A protein has these predicted regions:
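Conserved functional loop/turn residues at catalytic and ligand-binding sites
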Residues: 92, 96, 101, 126, ...
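Iron-sulfur (Fe-S) cluster-binding segments and ferredoxin-like electron-carrier domains
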Residues: 76-87, 99-113
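A secondary-structure boundary/capping signal
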Residues: 68, 88-89, 133, 167, ...
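Auxiliary Fe-S-binding modules of radical SAM enzymes
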Residues: 17-85, 116, 120, 150-162, ...
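Core AdoMet radical
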Residues: 101-117, 124-175, 181-215, 229, ...
Length: 322
């Protein structure tokens, strides 16, 4: 755990070795926790009839949403519009990424009835675009992939005409697991890059930048007609030049949709926020990314992977694919 008021800095080894070194450095709280919050970072409070109906539905079917588990700031807006990202494979993640609020621990065995219940919720909500994600299950990679394939099939059965978007973990690069998901033909396959390579060891515990790119490349190779997508957080200490290099790498593996959003520290136990990006900076990043050939770029302070996911997919010209 990182001590309060500190952060990691990654620098070149002092002896010139070709490797990065992590060291603990003091962080100025005034820089990491801005006050008051600017207007463009204020989200709608989670209230309203639809919000409470969706919450009751999730509870009645024993389902989790990443909206709640990850403390998403857009939960009020999205749930009021009856859109949610369902999170499968339990509510305990086997990894300890420094940015993520999802609980960590040793999960129970995978519940293979969960895909049916997720599809039931999708059908009851009348969704035209469903987003499903999961925690990391490094204890059962192939089982986790099978659950994704099952939920895609179940949604097609219970909610015909609904597009399916999956936000998947990296499955530790397991090709069988990745192929299992892709062969179920989700209309959109999302796997987030999250940060720049230099910060991976701090931001994404257990992940590798090259593995992320290879997953997206392999998914597109297996099904060229499918839409691939990835997201990046800003405000963790990255440089603009590093972000642009990530965008170029994603474009090189033919990633179709890119999302860019502000990292917001979930609690004092998580990585400090290095700085806030302004709406103008997000607009500039979007302009640069579009020049690289992405079919859609969603860029803004409150943007998250599945924020306006339906509109993102529609902007690519995507229709329901089977």
């Amino acid at each position: 755990m990182i001590p309060v008021g500190c952060s990691f800095r990654i620098s070149r080894h002092p002896c010139g070795y070709n490797k990065n070194v992590m060291e603990l450095v003091q962080i100025d709280p005034a820089r990491t926790i801005p006050a008051p919050k600017p207007e463009w970072l204020k989200a709608r409070a989670p209230v309203g009839e639809n919000y409470h109906d969706l919450k009751r539905l999730a509870r009645s079917l024993n389902l989790h949403t990443v909206c709640e588990s990850a403390h998403c700031p857009n939960i009020g807006e999205c749930w009021q519009h009856k859109t949610a990202t369902f999170m499968m494979l339990g509510n305990l993640c086997t990894r300890r990424c420094g940015f993520c609020a999802v609980p960590k621990g040793r999960p129970d065995a995978i519940d293979f009835d969960e895909p049916r219940r997720v599809a039931e919720a999708v059908a009851k909500l009348g969704l035209l675009h469903a987003v499903v994600t999961s925690v990391n299950r490094d204890d059962d990679l192939v089982g986790g992939a099978r659950a994704f394939a099952m939920v895609i099939d179940e949604i097609r059965r219970q909610a015909p005409g609904c597009r399916v978007e999956v936000l998947i973990p990296d499955f530790q690069g397991n090709k069988e697991a990745i192929r299992t998901v892709v062969e179920a033909r989700p209309e959109v396959l999302n796997h987030n890059t999250e940060s720049v390579p230099r910060l991976y060891r701090v931001v994404r515990s257990g992940a590798r930048y090259e593995r992320t790119l290879e997953l997206l490349r392999y998914a597109k190779e297996l099904w060229p007609a499918g839409i691939t997508k990835s997201g990046v957080m800003v405000g963790l200490g990255e440089e603009t030049s590093e972000l642009l290099e990530v965008f170029r790498d994603l474009a090189a593996v033919h990633c179709d949709i890119l999302t860019i959003g502000q990292y917001l520290r979930p609690s004092r136990d998580h990585l400090p926020m290095a700085r806030l990006y302004t709406p103008r900076e997000f607009a500039e990043l979007k302009t640069e990314a579009l020049k690289m050939g992405f079919r859609h770029v969603e860029s803004g302070p409150l943007v998250r992977s599945s924020y306006h996911a339906h509109e993102q997919a529609a902007s690519t010209g995507l229709t329901v694919l089977t």
